[in-house]
Amino acid sequence: MPILSLSSTRNSVLTRIYDYLKALVQQVIVPNVEDDKSSKSTPFEKLEPAKQNHPQKDCCATEKDDLVDVSELFPKQNNKQLSLTSKSSVVPCALNLDNLETPFSIKIDNNGAVTTQLNLDEPILRGPSRGEPAKLQNDLISSPPLEESYINNDQYKALFPSNFLPITPVSSVITPASKKSIDESPLSDEVQGIADESSETLPYICHYCDARFRIRGYLTRHIKKHAKRKAYHCPFFDNSISQELRCHTSGGFSRRDTYKTHLKSRHFTYPEGVKPQDRNKSPGVCTQCGEHFSTSESWVENHIEAGSCKGLPEGYSEGIREKKKTSKMKMIKTSDGQTRFISSDESVSEPALQNKNCIEATVMQSKERPNDKIIPTKTEKNDFGIGTQWFERKQISRPTQTTQSRGPTEVQNLKEWSIISPPILSPQNASSVPQEYQSSRYTLHMDSPALSSASSALSPLSGDPITTTETNKSYPLDSEQSLLEPDKTEEDAINQSKESNMISINEMLQKQMDFELLGENHLKETQDYLALYKKAYGIEF
């Protein structure tokens, strides 16, 4: 009895183990009955359907990623940003040399020879051709429409306002916002001078180049560009030593900040190991006298500019005080009603002497200065046009001589005397400031009374003054005085000198603006460039 019970228990345990293993095998390996009926296939062919039905999982994927559909690498439809092409002001470059209208055209014949021609008779059209605006408009209209949500976006409204127009050379440069920023910018002197010279909002005029400015400080800084002698000069600059040992090339500076930077870097000694960016807060020693200072800024203001340094040259402190009194700008109104601002003597240059208003304003200022010692009287040739020479005025003492009535022989010799007209002054080798402008002492006394027949004979000596026996007055023989016009006034002589000078300047400018000559020069330069291009690259046009 016990033996039978044990055998039955063993059979039942084995049966259960077999059923468990069978169920486990069925779960791991799923048999396909139809595969047995079909034709035999390789093991690799059997694995392909299994791979398609059971794709491999990404080991880095999470449960959150499984919920989102993963898109392909390249989408089926183009999802480009439509805002880049819709209502865009940027037009693709489509330069057509055949339709390009320029004042200078180049043609190439069958033999490869290049011929050039100036289009002087044809008007130059600036901008797009006739059919181009309509084409651009059609391109903008035919652009794909944008979504309404994108159009209502604040960023889109800021980029493309309602009154949007394509960019033009004027609208892209000058806008209400950009004009305001240009007016307030302290770094654009040239823009300030170019913008709307006839506007009343630019009352400050440069008396050298007629540039206008809205703020007086801009004009003061602009005038320094015309200066021959800079506003600031290094007191330790020595021109006698060699160029390699000098602290600066010229020692002159137009701006105070560059002047102070030069002093701090070349004439102030810092401790070892101090970086350049930390020098403003670092102490140091004066190179000239050896005195110690907490900062370089205090050394410049309290030691150098105050004149307390022992190494400064003699008279440096007095020169600074005198400069503060005399270097301020002064407002002068000219005869045509314009307001001119004259600065110190450091801001005189050659172009100023060719300006009528500048001449008048300079003369008015020179007459009002208390210590009227120096005035520009002559200019030298300079490529940059700022080479004014300064000369001290010297009083010329002319002895007053009287002449008696001359005999018939002297009168006959006087008639044969050749009268030489004053030469035409050129803007390079002659002064545009006439001699009578230099001082009231040198004005022409041309208001002569009617000469009698006995006293009408003039002295043949050009150096002798003209006198009469009735009035006993002396008339100097200046270049503006003509022997045949004794009743000529001082104003007529001044106008004659100005007109002769302006005529020569106008003739010179007219020669420079000769279009045929400019075209020939342009043609020659183009031919040289084509020859060089052909030689370098071996390409013929």
Swiss-Prot record:
Ranges of biased composition (kind: Polar residues): 465-482
Composition bias of kind Low complexity appears in 452-462
Q: How does it sit in the membrane?
A: Peripheral membrane protein
Q: SMART domains attached here?
A: ZnF_C2H2
On modification after translation, the UniProt record reads: Activated by the amino acid-induced proteolytic removal of an N-terminal inhibitory domain by serine protease SSY5, an intrinsic component of the SPS-sensor. Processing requires at least 2 components of the SCF(GRR1) ubiquitin ligase complex, namely the F-box protein GRR1 and the E2 enzyme CDC34, but does not depend on the proteasome. Processing is negatively regulated by the protein phosphatase 2A regulatory subunit RTS1.
Places the protein is found: Cell membrane; Nucleus
Provide the transmembrane region boundaries: none
Where are the residues of the annotated region I?
13-32
The disulfide bridges present are none
- Residues covered by region (II): 73-105
**Which keywords annotate this record?**
Cell membrane, DNA-binding, Membrane, Metal-binding, Nucleus, Repeat, Zinc, Zinc-finger, Zymogen
Origin: domain of life: Eukaryota
Q: Name one GO molecular function term.
A: RNA polymerase II cis-regulatory region sequence-specific DNA binding
ZnF (C2H2-type) ranges: 204-226, 232-267, 284-309
Q: What is its main location?
A: membrane
One Pfam family linked to the record: zf-C2H2
Q: What GO terms fall under cellular component here? A: cytoplasm; nucleus; plasma membrane
Question: What does the domain comment read?
Answer: The N-terminal inhibitory domain contains conserved sequence elements important for cytoplasmic retention (Region I) and proteolytic processing (Region II) of the protein. Region I is also required for ASI1/2/3-mediated negative regulation of transcription.
- Tell me the function of this protein: Transcription factor involved in the regulation of gene expression in response to extracellular amino acid levels. Synthesized as latent cytoplasmic precursor, which, upon a signal initiated by the plasma membrane SPS (SSY1-PTR3-SSY5) amino acid sensor system, becomes proteolytically activated and relocates to the nucleus, where it induces the expression of SPS-sensor-regulated genes, including the amino-acid permeases BAP2 and BAP3. Binding to promoters is facilitated by DAL81.
Q: Which PANTHER family match?
A: FI01119P, ZINC FINGER PROTEIN
Additional observations: Present with 6490 molecules/cell in log phase SD medium.
Q: What is this protein called?
A: Transcription factor STP2
